[in-house]
């Protein structure tokens, strides 16, 4: 049977099988529903904060904290969408720019995106960061607007490149005469203030808003509302809905995970030709998502977090100390030509890798020698090879044999 015939069968079976979905896009992360259950207080507080722009006044900067999947981005986009409509109604000269800092990846690209949002064309490379910022500032001032900048996952960029770009943005109003800027910073890390210059933090966090995790009951309500829009009537079983809610609640109340579980469970049922989505389909979806989650986490790590993880990989020990990891990390930075972080900063990155489930970092007592942290991989070495081996920057480092690894573990790598 030729490939064309195989595909004909696949497509015809899909079209003729039981239809589970009305609209699967409703279960995607970027879908903003008409209602955001259990976030009414946050919507009101953010709305009150940004409302002054409707009277051509600059609103306060605000920092929004919360773990992944707690509704930070959805609430921000929801509020600003409604604010945009009101601004047009009242004739207020307001403009917004949303930037995901993890996806953007550098200060240059942040300033380039801001420049483009006020009508400037910026080359992909070739200018200094300072030159791009100056062009943005000049173009913005000529626009005569109130400009609200949303920096989502700003913690990722600050940890990778420092907070110099944030310092420039928080002081920009001092040099503008015709426009005004307000900043909404969104962070997954509640400890971000530890990485910020106190002057930057005080300017940025004029207002603060913390999003607590959803509980199982709230997640169930969210999924129930979305399921009415996404699935055909009678397709989703009550047990499948409950297990999705419970699993996501166990993962710090992550609504994104709950939505992913529900969508993938529906797709599993769809491929099997099942008429209903059951708990077993959710269990299969969980396994599939977990693998993809780890791959995505590895791909999205910052440069130095990848180097730290590779250092643990090369040690290949049941448990390693921070000092041993730092020795390997030092070598890998040299091979890549990258700047070196301090051992204390490396310890912070180890803690972040631990919180992501990529390594296990446990403090153990060494008796009269005090306490030390023992670190080991929590994911398979083959998965690290597969993911990092596909990145030109890291493929050679995977095969590299660090001298410190030979010294520490007798030649095992």
Give the role of each language-model region.
Residues 3-21, 28, 59, 102-222, ...:
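Mid-core helix/loop region of P-loop NTP-binding domains shared across ATPases and GTPases
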Residues 291-311, 315-319:
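Short alpha-helical segments that sit at the start of domains
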Residues 316-413:
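Terminal-proximal interaction/regulatory segments of ATP-powered molecular machines
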Residues 57-80:
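Walker A/P-loop nucleotide-binding motif
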Residues 1-59, 411-413:
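A short, basic N-terminal segment
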Residues 268-291:
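Conserved C-terminal helix/linker of AAA+ ATPases
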């Amino acid at each position: 049977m030729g490939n064309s015939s195989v595909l004909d069968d696949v497509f015809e079976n899909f079209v003729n099988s039981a239809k589970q979905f009305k609209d699967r896009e409703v279960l995607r992360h970027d879908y903003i529903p008409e209602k955001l259950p259990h976030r009414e207080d946050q919507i009101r507080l953010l709305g009150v904060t940004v409302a002054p722009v409707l009277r051509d006044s600059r609103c306060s900067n605000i920092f929004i904290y919360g773990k992944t999947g707690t509704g930070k981005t959805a609430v921000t986009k929801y509020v600003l969408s409604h604010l945009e409509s009101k601004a047009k109604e009242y004739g207020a000269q307001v403009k917004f720019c949303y930037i995901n800092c993890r996806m953007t990846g550098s200060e240059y690209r942040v300033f380039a995106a801001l420049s483009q949002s006020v009508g400037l064309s910026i080359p992909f490379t070739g200018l200094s960061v300072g030159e791009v910022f100056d062009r943005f500032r000049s173009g913005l001032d000529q626009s005569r607007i109130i400009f609200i900048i949303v920096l989502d996952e700003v913690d990722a960029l600050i940890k990778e490149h420092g907070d110099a770009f944030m310092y420039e943005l928080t002081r920009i109003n001092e040099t503008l005469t015709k426009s005004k800027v307000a900043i909404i910073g969104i962070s997954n890390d509640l400890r971000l203030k530890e990485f910020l210059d106190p002057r930057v933090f005080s300017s940025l966090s004029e207002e603060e808003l913390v999003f607590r995790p959803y509980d199982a009951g709230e997640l169930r309500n969210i999924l129930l509302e979305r399921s009415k829009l996404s699935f055909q009537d009678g397709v989703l079983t009550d047990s499948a809905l409950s297990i999705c809610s419970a699993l996501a609640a166990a993962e710090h109340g992550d609504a994104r995970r709950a939505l992913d579980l529900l969508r993938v469970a529906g797709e599993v049922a769809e491929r099997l030709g099942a008429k209903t989505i059951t708990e077993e389909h959710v269990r299969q979806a969980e396994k599939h998502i977990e693998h993809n989650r780890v791959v995505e986490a590895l791909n999205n790590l910052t440069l130095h977090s990848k180097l730290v993880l590779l250092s643990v990989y090369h040690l290949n020990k049941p448990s390693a100390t921070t000092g041993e990891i730092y020795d390997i990390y030092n070598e890998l930075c040299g091979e890549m030509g990258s700047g070196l972080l301090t051992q204390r900063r490396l310890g912070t990155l180890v803690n972040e890798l631990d919180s992501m489930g990529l390594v296990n970092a446990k403090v153990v007592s060494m008796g009269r020698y005090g306490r030390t942290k023992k670190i080991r991989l929590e994911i398979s070495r083959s998965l690290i090879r597969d993911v990092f081996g596909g990145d030109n920057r890291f493929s050679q480092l995977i095969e590299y044999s660090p001298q410190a690894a030979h010294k520490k573990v007798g030649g095992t790598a």
